[in-house]
Amino acid sequence: MEQEKWGIVGIGTLGGAILKQLSNGKPNIGFYHPNAEKAAGIAQANPGHQSLTVEELDSFDFLILALPADRLVPFVQSLLDSGLSLTRVTLINMATVVKTAELNRQFPQLRFLGMKFMGHAVDLRERGNGLFITEPNERFASVQERAIRFFEHVGQVIVDKEDVVEEVNSLATRIAVKAAFELEHAIREGGYRQEYASRALVSVAPEVMRAYASGTMGHFARKIVEQLMEEQQES
C-alpha cells in the first residue's frame, strides 16, 4: 500500500509545534513556506521534514492548513488561481474561527476536513500530547479516519462539534485574563514589587494550574486548596 503523503502550510506557532512533534521517528511531513531562506532554516531545525514547492502541493493526499483565519481562504484561492486543482487533496482546516462547512460550501469542488486544536501552541510544542477536535463527517468518513490516525501521532483526537474549540478556548482565555488582572491587583494592593507580579503570572500561577489539572500539586499548594474549600463550605 502506497504511503500517504502529508504536507503542512503555515509554519507559525501552531504549524511549527506540529512539525516538532512529528519528529523523532514519527511520520515525516512536507512543509511549504514561500520564503526560500526561511524554508531552509525550518528544514534545518526539523530534520526529516522536506521543504515543498507550491506546485508540489497538488500531489499530496492531505494538506494541513495551519494558517491564520484571515489568510486561509485567500491562500486556497491563490493556489486555484495559479492553476492547481487540489481535487485529490484533503485540506485540513485548523483555523479556530473558520467553519469547515462554510469552506466546503465556498469551494464545492474541494474537500475540507476540520481538525481544530484545543489549547496553546507553545504547550503543544514543548510538551506534545495535544487535543484535537474533528466534527463528525459522514460525507468524508474514510479520509476522516485516516486523518484521525495521523493526528494521534501528535495527541488525542475527539469527534465532536468543532464549535466547542472556540467556545472552550474563549472561556479559558477570559477566565485566565480575569485571574491575571486580579493577581496583579492583589500584588499591587499588598505593596509588593512589580517584579513579583510578573514572576507570579509567568511562573507560579501557570505551574500551579498545570499541577492542579494533573493531580500533582505539592504540599504547599494542597494546603491552600484545603483552605479554599473550607472557605467555600463556610460561605
Regions inferred by a protein language model and the residue ranges of each:
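NAD(P)+-binding Rossmann beta1-loop-alpha1 motif at the extreme N-terminus of oxidoreductases
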Residues: 1-53, 186-192
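Short, structured coil segments at secondary-structure junctions
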Residues: 25, 45-47, 87, 106-110, ...
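Short, charged/polar "capping" segments at the starts of alpha-helices
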Residues: 36-41, 99-102, 140-143
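Short acidic-hydrophobic, aromatic-tinged amphipathic segments that line or gate anion-handling sites
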Residues: 48-56, 158-162
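Alpha-helix C-terminal capping/helix-to-coil transition sites in glycosyltransferase folds
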Residues: 58-60
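Rossmann-like NAD(P)(H) cofactor-binding subdomain of soluble oxidoreductases
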Residues: 62-125
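Internal alpha-helical scaffold of NAD(P)-dependent oxidoreductase catalytic cores
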Residues: 106-111, 126-205
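Interdomain hinge/lid region at the active-site interface
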Residues: 183-235
